[in-house]
Amino acid sequence: MIQPDSYVRSLLKRSPGESVTARGWVKTRRDSKNVHFIQLNDGSSPVDLQVVLDAGVVPEDVVAKITTGACISVEGDLVASMGKGQAVEIKARALTVHGTADPEHYPLQKKKHTLETLRELGHLRTRSNTFGAVFRVRNALACAIHKFFQDRGFMYVHTPVISASDAEGAGSMFQVTTLDLQSPKPADFTGDFFGKHTYLTVSGQLEAEIFAHAFANVYTFGPTFRAENSNTPRHLAEFYMIEPEMAFCDLKDNQDLAEAFLKSQVEYVVNACGPDLDFLAKWYDPELRKTLDGLMNASFERITYTEAIDLLQRSGRSFEFPTQWGSDMQSEHERYLTEEVFNKPVIVTDYPKDIKAFYMRGNDDGKTVAAMDVLAPRIGEIIGGSQREERHDVLLQRIREMAAHGLREEAYWWYLDLRRFGGVEHAGFGMGFERMLMYLTGMKNIRDVIPFPRTPGNAEF
């Protein structure tokens, strides 16, 4: 196992004269008359560690195995580097080849590969410079999320992956069953493993509300699933969601937390992953640093849905999707508001109840609910949330109204019970982890920020 002080990122910061061991995978080998220069990386740093291997240290048949992709370990001394880009390099005393990579067949040779090509190499793309940077940012973002909530006293809650309820009421769910669905007989789900219809979860929100009614401030961070046949750069069938739920919290408190949360995530990643962000800015998005600084330093604009529709209708723009009160905003509308009207993130609140979920608290006007969407330049919606309906009678009526859309009152008996026994105003939101990663990395396709993308027709690896 590589020890913390032996990672490449640590070795690059150490002083000349130290005796060290480095392990990792060969990026390149360059040969001179009496010396070999090896670029070594173990995934911990966007910068490779140079290994200087004098002729004769190992037999030539071993040198021949030191090709791109090979796994090696090196013992030697750190010396001041004469090359550009690093302060130190290893003067090798011994080298071991643990695993070879035949250059005739290893697909990640020293050249720029398209993202499409790398998606086909999900078992190897993690070794590329691009995905090394992306997945280090992914790791940092996960750490930032836990730190933000733990520093504020939130409890981390594990919610079920298999559920009998639809938190979104949208019906786009993966069914879980042990029954033989090819049987000519109609499926009897009372005889199924769980004795009822069950699905992969679309959200942990409803279960998180249970914990919010006992521990006040909680959050979930786990996988969610949507059986939407959307083959776009913004959609996945399996992705991760962060969902805080807070008791004694209204819509304004929810907006305040969401803004602080986003700024905190960006600040953490900028501080933790500077070289990775510089690499991604160089190759994929020259405006990345400017974009991230803009979010950190902006005061988010807050407008109602009605005000947003008015701005869109008065814009004089010919949108692909016409705007009218009662219709959901599309990506083009979100980007217009954030990039052209306000030039910063925007929180839109108080949406028509007919386009939002059943659990959102009804406003006094009877037409809108206390919902919010946080929109960011370049990507659109990045957070969706609401104050939850805490009034038992109002929630029950709303569930009954939604029966035509597949909501079954009996499936939500426990959710209604929360309002009967010590209910309180509460709120929460959800953030798509991969959507945030797209924003942080400048990647344009969501398949490039998750290790193993699950999309229609694709479940490889």
From Swiss-Prot:
Keyword Nucleotide-binding on entry: yes
InterPro entries with a match to the protein in the record: Aa-tRNA-synt_II, aa-tRNA-synth_II, aa-tRNA-synth_II/BPL/LPL, Asn-tRNA-ligase, Asp/Asn-tRNA-synth_IIb, NA-bd_OB-fold, NA-bd_OB_tRNA
MF GO annotations: asparagine-tRNA ligase activity; ATP binding; nucleic acid binding
Location of the protein in the cell: Cytoplasm
GO biological process, alphabetically ordered: asparaginyl-tRNA aminoacylation
Superkingdom of the organism of origin: Bacteria
Similarity field: Belongs to the class-II aminoacyl-tRNA synthetase family.
Oligomer and partners: Homodimer.
Descriptive protein name: Asparagine--tRNA ligase
Encoding gene (name): asnS
